[in-house]
């Protein structure tokens, strides 16, 4: 099973790339994390938030089109479901049992287009706080690693 993080944004600071890479490399080969970046759309007087989200959604859809048809889509959204670490670990186990890859969608500054959120099988949120988009990549990778460590009784997670 592959975990694909599809994130709007590119040219992240080095510390973001380092943090993401650190957790991605800790994952076992059978549960690899891959990052696919999508170019953000610039907001202007002729590009309102809805237009920006639609254009970014088209780019995200292009990435999703390159993935398996059975790929499960999970959208990160401020109104998504809260998961505890143990709940995320259980969900990860369920996804592994069901087979297929999982794509996690991280929107741009204006969020994800409503059509993408509707297409997702699950909406989750990492925090009630507003987080920088680059940091969300690092936090998601860390939480996926932590969830995996729970399933393996690895000492990384001590709760």
From Swiss-Prot:
Q: What is its EC number?
A: 2.1.1.177
Question: Cross-referenced SUPFAM superfamilies, in alphabetical order?
Answer: alpha/beta knot
One of the record's GO molecular function terms: rRNA (pseudouridine-N3-)-methyltransferase activity
Keyword Disulfide bond appears in the UniProt entry: no
Q: Which reaction does it catalyse?
A: pseudouridine(1915) in 23S rRNA + S-adenosyl-L-methionine = N(3)-methylpseudouridine(1915) in 23S rRNA + S-adenosyl-L-homocysteine + H(+)
List, alphabetically, the InterPro entries matched: Alpha/beta_knot_MTases (IPR029028), RlmH-like (IPR003742), tRNA_m1G_MTases_N (IPR029026)
- What Pfam families does the record point to? SPOUT_MTase
Q: Which residues bind S-adenosyl-L-methionine?
A: 76, 107, 126-131
Q: Where would you say this protein principally sits, based on its record?
A: cytoplasm
Q: Which domain of life is it from?
A: Bacteria
What EC class does the entry list? transferase
Transit peptide keyword on record = no
NCBIfam families (alphabetical): PRK00103.1-4, tRNA_RlmH_YbeA
Family statement drawn from the similarity comment of this UniProt entry: Belongs to the RNA methyltransferase RlmH family.
Quaternary structure and interacting proteins, as annotated? Homodimer.
Q: What does this protein do?
A: Specifically methylates the pseudouridine at position 1915 (m3Psi1915) in 23S rRNA.
The protein, known as: Ribosomal RNA large subunit methyltransferase H
Name the source organism.
Cupriavidus necator (strain ATCC 17699 / DSM 428 / KCTC 22496 / NCIMB 10442 / H16 / Stanier 337) (Ralstonia eutropha)
Report the gene name: rlmH
